[in-house]
Amino acid sequence: SWLYNNYFYIIEYYASRYLFYSNITLKPSESKNLLLLSNSTMSTIWPDEHLGYALPILNNFLKPHNIKEILVITYATPCVRIDDGNIQCEGNLILENVSNSFQKLGIKINLLDIEASNINQQSQIKNAEAIYITGGNTFLLKKALYEKGVIDVIKEKIKEGIPIIGVSAGSIIHCPTIKTTNDMPIVCVDSCNVLNSIPFQINAHYNHIENTNGFRMETRDKRLKQYLQNNRTIGSSTNPNFVIGLREGSMIHVSGDKAELAGFNSRPAELLMLNKDGDLIKNQIKIAQELMIYCYYKLLLERSEV
């Protein structure tokens, strides 16, 4: 019948209308230009080379903007005061590798001075032509963004459309909240809200492994199901009703009001959500798939909202 033959297109139509009219759509008025990676290294492809596996995609992402220098923000990496009184930050230990990687693209790095005054740090970000936010601990990163007063500055740079790259924790902070991070809360934060650049949650380094040999820790899927069970409000920008589990070697490219999956993993990502009975449902997302239409198409099917 006509209805059967056109079922997918009908669902896609309603999904696109739902995106357009709800408050969780990517805003077309904002010239977002984000590349959100799950991880920085892939030992199976480019051993020990920071961002090495992603260089072809990074080049395509940055080249149209004629970027000469990129600001590197290492808030997510822990710092300790060593015996001689100096402060040693883990982020500084990878800078040579970061510099070598971007040098291959003809781009210099400029490290954000995390010891400078808040005003000077804000000024560095305001003047950046591109930004790279490294991975580490999401709670450390979130705490620093607010304490340094740079959260609103970064939001403005996102609206300007400058290229912004995030890895792991640096990707999670573009979600509405940090509730789907894998990290321990090694510092206290006053809320879970972050940049809200994208209207859905990411789980970086996604890899569901069932418990074996007496190991009783909760699985990744069980934890993400708990998140979904406690954040089920449809249409809320602070409580997305699905999670994208990004496997290693995968990334999300956000351009304006479009979000697309990219990367080098044969099983790049999983869409995790609850059906109307509260059961966890997973669907594999393919490379080059337009995420928003696909995710809400699947969501509407499972919830029978059409």
Positions of the model-derived regions?
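Flexible gly/pro-rich beta->alpha loop and the following alpha-helix that scaffold active-site loops
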Residues: 107-163
